[in-house]
């Protein structure tokens, strides 16, 4: 079974409805925002409640544990997201309103995200760049990218990011 979050899949609908409901569920949002690692997210009651809802919507019980860890990372990050931006995540990182030609996320910081040695480092790095993007990302895109994190997603991000031109001397 391929894990896919979109508006047509059960798990995509549950995730999007949950995220939209976070505005009114300030306690759950605060608990998730305080989590400093993927493990800390996975141990929170709000994550566990959502995980049970996702299982009911089609998230397989036998899903590999690394998928569950990646889901926890996505949920922790989504608690920081305030706006659903339909653009691809890397595109959002490279296009910043009011910054002229400068990207929201610098080239160096973007490369560091791509080179994250493990999921916790990626989680921390993404949590730090969310304010640079005004807390607006593609909700379902972020979940998909994290659950499927690997070379294919990294390459897609590299192709989507609008690398700034170097000034000519």
Where are these regions (language model features)?
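Basic, alpha-helical nucleic-acid-binding regions used in initiation and control of genome expression
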Residues: 2, 7-169
């Amino acid at each position: 079974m391929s894990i896919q979050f979109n508006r047509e899949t059960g798990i995509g609908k549950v995730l999007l409805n949950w995220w939209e409901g976070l505005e009114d569920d300030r306690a759950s949002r605060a608990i998730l925002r305080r989590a400093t690692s993927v493990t800390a997210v996975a141990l929170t009651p709000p994550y566990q409640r959502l995980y049970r809802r996702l299982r009911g919507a089609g998230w397989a019980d036998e899903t590999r544990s690394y998928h569950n860890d990646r889901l926890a990372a996505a949920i922790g990050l989504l608690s920081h997201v305030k706006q659903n931006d339909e653009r691809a995540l890397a595109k959002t990182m490279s296009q910043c309103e009011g910054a002229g030609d400068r990207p929201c996320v610098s080239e160096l910081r973007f490369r560091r995200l791509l080179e994250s040695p493990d999921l916790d480092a990626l989680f921390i790095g993404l949590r730090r760049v969310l304010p640079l993007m005004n807390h607006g990302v593609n909700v379902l895109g972020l979940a998909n990218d994290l659950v499927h994190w690997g070379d294919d997603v990294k390459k897609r991000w590299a192709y989507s990011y609008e690398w700034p031109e170097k000034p000519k001397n």
